[in-house]
Amino acid sequence: MLEQIKNNFTESIQTQIAASELLGPSIEHAGMMMVQCLLGGNKIISCGNGGSAGHAQHFCAQLLNKYETERPSLPAISLNSDISTITSIANDYQYDEVFSKQIRALGHNGDVLLAISTSGNSRNVVKAIESAVSRDIPIIALTGFDGGDISGLLGEGDVEIRVPSARTSRIQEVHLVVLHSLCEIIDTTLFPQGDS
């Protein structure tokens, strides 16, 4: 058992090192997309399922409250947060529509969609991206494996941050580091703290 625990840490570290070497430019580009969105008076909309739903909510909480330094609240909406809306849409239509209907109601040109799916194949996230595309909302997709269906939906103005792993747990661990890196880019760009 102890050996397996050690192996988990080793594999996580190796995946994070590989991701840091591969994903830096994409993370930086995504962070600056978010900065421009916020400077334009727009909002970041996030969605995902399971652990990715938790990441989507966590990211929005970091923007609405703070990341590591005191600053004004920033506009962000997690489409996972309103259980009444999610269950209403799932019951009256289908679960595939729980995010796309919200985007059609809440999303506007100038916003950014942060779509999180470890497999890249989550149907409701795919439909969210399709709704965002129809509203000219740029997409930042956090994926893993081969990028799945999501990878094929992204256009020139979108960014895919694909973790180089085929293991969901490792992908989710790197996604959290990516999200914290995005928070740091936003905070240090919008609210520079001097030499710190």
UniProtKB/Swiss-Prot annotation:
EC number: 5.3.1.28
Organism: Colwellia psychrerythraea (strain 34H / ATCC BAA-681) (Vibrio psychroerythus)
Residues that, per the record, bind substrate: 49-51, 62, 91-92, 117-119, 122, 172
NCBIfam families per UniProt: PRK13936.1
Pfam family membership, one: SIS_2
Family: Belongs to the SIS family. GmhA subfamily.
Main location group: cytoplasm
Protein name (record): Phosphoheptose isomerase
Cofactor binding note of this UniProt entry: Binds 1 zinc ion per subunit.
Pathway field: Carbohydrate biosynthesis; D-glycero-D-manno-heptose 7-phosphate biosynthesis; D-glycero-alpha-D-manno-heptose 7-phosphate and D-glycero-beta-D-manno-heptose 7-phosphate from sedoheptulose 7-phosphate: step 1/1
List of residues binding Zn(2+): 58, 62, 172, 180
